[in-house]
Amino acid sequence: MTRPKSFRINAKNYFLTYPKCSLTKEEALSQLNNLETPTSKKYIKVCRELHENGEPHLHVLIQFEGKFQCKNQRFFDLVSPTRSAHFHPNIQGAKSSSDVKSYLEKDGDTLEWGEFQIDGRSARGGQQSANDAYAQALNTGSKSEALNVLRELAPKDYVLQFHNLNSNLDRIFTPPLEVYVSPFLSSSFDRVPEELEEWVAENVKDAAARPLRPISIVIEGESRTGKTVWARSLGPHNYLCGHLDLSPKVYSNDAWYNVIDDVDPHYLKHFKEFMGAQRDWQSNTKYGKPVQIKGGIPTIFLCNPGPNSSYKEYLDEEKNSALKAWALKNAEFITLNEPLYSGTYQGPTQNSEEEVHPEEEN
């Protein structure tokens, strides 16, 4: 007579199913975590499901630090804390812990402990498994969560293609640019020179009404004359202050105009592209990937007097004589001798009782 085959499973990852188990996820996790094993437990995930007839059952994934040889069919039995009842599981070695984890997560009623140990194997295998991983990553809705999914489900790509994944997910999950809302009513600026008003009327327009080659403008004046807040109150724009960042996180190709504020002209990259409202040019600023700029919009250059800020003084340098001749054909130059406002004004709303000083914003 053949002896019955003895029970033995030797695996790092165990998949347990408890049919007709009334324990909560918390009770099951606590009991499993307290089991004494020769090799340390690294991760436990418990999923509670209901059959169509309403009977509950539990699925569990347990990951060990090394292979754990189980010879006792009752080792993973759970006990009811309120009545004399034992719950015996079906015990299997999990060939792919990633597949088991995905299976447990399909209904969402789960509880976990520890840190999941990434497993490169998948019982599904092939291209379909890779497509599933990337589809799941895209459905997360954020870059950080997408990277976590790929780290778990596509570890080879995560290690070998991390740079590309990081860059591509930056583009895919780029948040919409925050729309700037001017804190001042247009009526606050009651001393705007006529030549500035005319420049705005002719050049700051949407794409349909904008001139094919709009003219840019350089506005030079002392601090606290309202240059910045006035320039930013004219419509949708890109605001570049101190240095250039043309990444999609900051720069919009749908803006009506650019504002370049307090950038030393000696170090202004793409001087002609901005001032000449050039179209379809590429930026390869340091430490960033090339960015395609739609262009065709005017730029307001804001500066203070002085050799390290004034565009006029920069263009008056002998070495820049050719650039100056070009600039005079592509931009207007205005010097402010007084503020663009006459005093104190109501703030963003007419009902505001607090007096607001535009110069405090510039």
Swiss-Prot record:
Q: Which GO terms describe its biological process?
A: biological process involved in interaction with host; DNA replication
- CRESS-DNA virus Rep endonuclease domain residues: 8-116
Organism classification: Viruses, Monodnaviria, Shotokuvirae, Cressdnaviricota, Repensiviricetes
User: Which InterPro entries does the record match to this protein?
Assistant: CRESS_DNA_REP, Gemini_AL1_CLV, Gemini_AL1_REP, Gemini_AL1_REP_central
Q: Where does ATP bind?
A: 221-228
Q: Give the species this sequence originates from.
A: Tomato leaf curl virus (strain Australia)
Q: Which residues bind a divalent metal cation?
A: 49, 57, 59, 107
Q: Which PROSITE patterns match?
A: CRESS_DNA_REP
Can you name one GO molecular function term for this protein?
Answer: endodeoxyribonuclease activity, producing 5'-phosphomonoesters
Location of the motif RCR-2: 57-59
Q: What is this protein called?
A: Replication-associated protein
Alphabetic keyword roster: ATP-binding, Covalent protein-DNA linkage, DNA replication, DNA-binding, Endonuclease, Helicase, Host nucleus, Host-virus interaction, Hydrolase, Metal-binding, Multifunctional enzyme, Nuclease, Nucleotide-binding, Nucleotidyltransferase, Transferase
Which residue stretches belong to region Binding to RBR1?
143-153
Listed GO CC annotations: host cell nucleus
Q: Where is the composition biased (Acidic residues)?
A: 352-362
